[in-house]
C-alpha cells in the first residue's frame, strides 16, 4: 500500500472483505489509466476532483476528509512534461487568486543515490527519509551513529537538508556527491529549471534536495507549494514512473493535487477573493417572461457561456430602464460574481434590453 495501515479507514462487507475509503488519488488514477487506456501509446492527460480520507488523529487540527483537485500526465517521461505539470500547478494557484506562494522542488533519486552508495538497507533508508523530510537534524545524526554508517556518508546525509534555495543550490548539491545516480538527478533538475524559465514561472520556484515524501512510489522530481496562512502545502505532486506496472501497464507518469480545503483557508486568511470567470451573462426577467429568459439562457449555455437567471426585484422604478438599472445595482451589491453582459426581459410582451456591464 501507499498509505500506512494505521491511517486508513477500514470497513468490512458481508463477505468479510476489507473495504477502505480512498486515502490517496494517485493509485486510483494509475489504475484508471491502466484499465481504460491499456493500448494507448500517446500521452494521456487527466483531471479530477474528489475527496480523500486519512485517519490523522495524531495531528490536531488537520482535516480527516479533504477535497483534492488534481491533474495527471501519463506516458510522457520527458523533463518538458515535468515542467508542464509544475507550470500548470503554478497557473492554477494564480488563477485562484493566490499571489504569494513558493514551489519547492526536489528529486527523490538524489537521496536514493546517496543511500545506495552508502549501502543502507530499506528499513534504515525509510527511517532516514522520515527524519530528513521532517527536517529533524538530530534524528538523522542519532540514526547514522546508531547504524555505524561511514563518516564520509554521514557528512553527506547530514548536509542534505542544507541543499535548498535558488538554482545555485543545485551546484552545491553536485559538488557534495560522486555517485552517478545522484548526479543525474541534479542534472535533471537543472534541465527542469531551464524549462520552467521558458514557461516564465521561475520566480515561483526554489529547490530543496531534502524534500521527500512518505509515498514510496515517487521516482523522480517531487514538488510542494507553500503559502502563508496554513501550516501545510496547498499543492503537491511528483513523478511516479513505476506505479502503473502494478496495474498491468508499463508507463511513466507525473501529476499533482491542489488541497482545496487548505487553499481556501489560505485565501480567506490572506483576504483574497477567488477569481471567477468574467465572461458570463446575467439574465433578469419580469413576471411572465421566464420562458423567454430560459430560452436565452439555454442558447448561451450551449455555447459554453455561463448564464445566470434571476427574477426582477419587485418595487423597482416603473420605467423599463429604471427597473433594469436597479436590478443590476442590487445584483452587484449582493453577489461577488462578475458578469460581462446583462439581458433584461421587460414585463408582458415587452422587448429585451441588452447592456455590457462595467466590471470595475
Ranges and model annotations:
Residues 1, 97-100, 113, 119, ...:
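Glycine-centered secondary-structure boundary/capping sites
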Residues 1-6, 10:
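Glycine-rich loop at the start of a catalytic domain that most often binds anionic cofactors/ligands
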Residues 6, 15-16, 26-39, 46-98, ...:
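Positively charged, Gly/Ser-enriched RNA/tRNA-binding surfaces
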Residues 44-55, 102-113:
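Short, glycine/charge-rich beta-strand/loop segments that flank catalytic centers
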Residues 103, 108-143:
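Short terminal or interdomain "cap/linker" segment that borders an active site or interface and mediates
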